[in-house]
Amino acid sequence: MYLVNPISGTGKKELLVNNIKKQTAARDIAYEVAYTTASGNYTLHKEKIVEEHFTDVVIIGGDGTVNQVVNNFRDIPYLQFGIIPLGSGNGLAYAAGIPKKPLQALHLIFDGTAKYTDAFTINNYFSCMLSGIGFDAKVAHDFAASASRGLFTYTQQSLINFFKAQPYQFEVIIDGFSFFTDAYFISIANSNQFGNNVTIAPQASLNDGLLDIVVVQKMHKARLPFAVLQQIRGNNKLQQMVEDMSQKNILYFQTPCILIRNLKHAPFHIDGEPMETSGEFKVSIIKDCFKLIQP
């Protein structure tokens, strides 16, 4: 089953869907095209998948669509998921090595291998890629409210928010160890990137049973872009918990679970989708949560 988000990305979908139909028919594969729901209710889709024994669901959309579909269908044990990335960021797809070009991604779905992939819960929510608290979440909220989509609009909102950004107060608790921090943002990552191959958690793996946590701490704002660039380039190594966590501009560590107290109610996003924030976030990995078709 192909599940198409009709509003994801910036291009028209009709030509792409027609090409997908032709390519799939040429492989003599039975298929059906359906569309995602704005309400998030997939009961009818799920009943059809189970009753008619669909083996694969191919998501044509971005990270938010992937989150919604996987969360609804992940309890069907035999089901495999594919992604044709058509969103603004496509972080999970690119982290998994799925090609950017839609028809190349389709050929991977035909010929690739389904591999177990982790996800995580954050309070009562599901995340399969990356969630964040603070600056990046503010960008996600403003991007969602924008009239236009795409990388240009996302970059524009990032620049606007950079000049207004102020650090937020957090308490971070990991396995009995805790520390307070003033930070511009905290990223909780299963994939290695925000999207568009911007790698915020270079050591992240989709199936290692660990969350990668990146804490961008308070620093002079002129230093902030350079510090983040060092993180993106992989120059910041994973670290152990130490008594004084203020020694580094950016903290980077791994853990299967974490508790974050959001003392100033910084904004929050899940897989790039703006969410209502909370004063506390309990985060836990879900090992081998679903099967994703990859190279």
Which role fits each region the language model picked out?
Residues 64-77:
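Short Gly/Thr/Asp-enriched flexible loops that form oxyanion-binding sites at enzyme active sites
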Residues 66, 88-92, 222:
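Short gly/pro/ser/thr-enriched loop/turn and capping motifs at secondary-structure boundaries
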Residues 6, 60-62, 86:
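Glycine-rich beta-strand-to-loop/alpha-helix junction loops that act as flexible
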Residues 174, 205, 217-295:
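ATP/nucleoside-binding phosphotransfer catalytic cores, i.e., glycine-rich phosphate-binding loops
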Residues 1-57, 71, 178:
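ATP/NTP phosphate-donor binding region
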Residues 27, 34, 75-188:
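Catalytic core of DAGKc-family lipid kinases
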Residues 132, 187-201, 274:
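Glycine-rich phosphate/pyrophosphate-binding beta-alpha loops
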